[in-house]
Amino acid sequence: MADLFAPAPEPSTELGRLRVLSKSAGIRVSPLILGGMSIGDAWSEILGSMSKERAFELLDAFYEAGGNFIDTANNYQNEQSEAWIGEWMVSRKLRDQIVIATKFTTDYKKYDVGGGKSANYCGNHKRSLHVSVRDSLRKLQTDWIDILYVHWWDYMSSIEEVMDSLHILVQQARSSIWVCLIRLPGLFLRQITTLNLMVKPLLASIKVNGTC
C-alpha cells in the first residue's frame, strides 16, 4: 500500500525529467525532442542519413535515456522517417509512451508520382491536410498524432480554410488537440485572432529559424 503513494524513481539522465508541454497542454514531454530528419537513407546525398538498424539504435538509446518526444515530417527522407519511427514504435510496443510531432504542407509525393503530378500533396489547403494526415497515420502505424505542425505558410490557402480544416481534424481526434503553426506571418496571426478562428482547445504560434 505504501508503494501507491511513493514518488517516482529518479530518472537515469536529465532527459527523463519530463515537463509540461505548455500552459494549455498538460502532456509531459522530455526537455529535448529527437529530430527525425536524418532517420532514413533516401537523402544520403544531400543531408544526413542512417540505416534502419542505426536508426533503431538511436531511438532505443533516446528512449532508454528517458526521452519520449520525437519530431518528424511527412516528407523527411522521402517518407522513410515516419515509416521507420512507426515501425520502431510497433516493434517495441511503445506507442503510448511516445509523444509524436509531425508536419504537413511540404510536397511529400514528388519523388514518387513525379513533379507536376503532386500539386495536391502540398500546401495548406484542406485536401493537402487530409491526405497528409491519412498517410502519416498509416506510416506511423498509429490512430492519432500528438502534435501536428503547419510546416510553412503557402500564402495561397485562405485563413478560413486552414483553420476550419484544422478544427475539424482535432474534432475527429486524428490529432491530440495540439496544432502548431510554424513561420506564421504576423499579419495572418492578427487576422486569425480578429476572426476568432482559433483552433480549440489550443493553437500555438511558433516562430523558428532555419529548416525543421
Curated annotation (Swiss-Prot):
- Which GO terms label this protein's molecular function in UniProt? oxidoreductase activity
Which SUPFAM superfamilies does the UniProt entry name for this protein? NAD(P)-linked oxidoreductase
Q: Which Enzyme Commission number(s) are on file for it? A: 1.1.1.-
Q: Which InterPro entries match?
A: AKR_Detox_Biosynth, NADP_OxRdtase_dom, NADP_OxRdtase_dom_sf
| Catalytic center residues | Y76 (proton donor)
Keywords (alphabetical) are: Oxidoreductase
Q: Where are the transmembrane segments?
A: none
Question: How would you classify this enzyme at the top EC level?
Answer: oxidoreductase
Q: Provide an example Pfam family for this protein.
A: Aldo_ket_red
Q: What does the sequence similarity comment in the record state about its family?
A: Belongs to the aldo/keto reductase family. Aldo/keto reductase 2 subfamily.
Protein name as it appears in the record: Putative aryl-alcohol dehydrogenase AAD6
* Species lineage: Eukaryota, Fungi, Dikarya, Ascomycota, Saccharomycotina
Gene symbol of the encoding locus:
AAD6
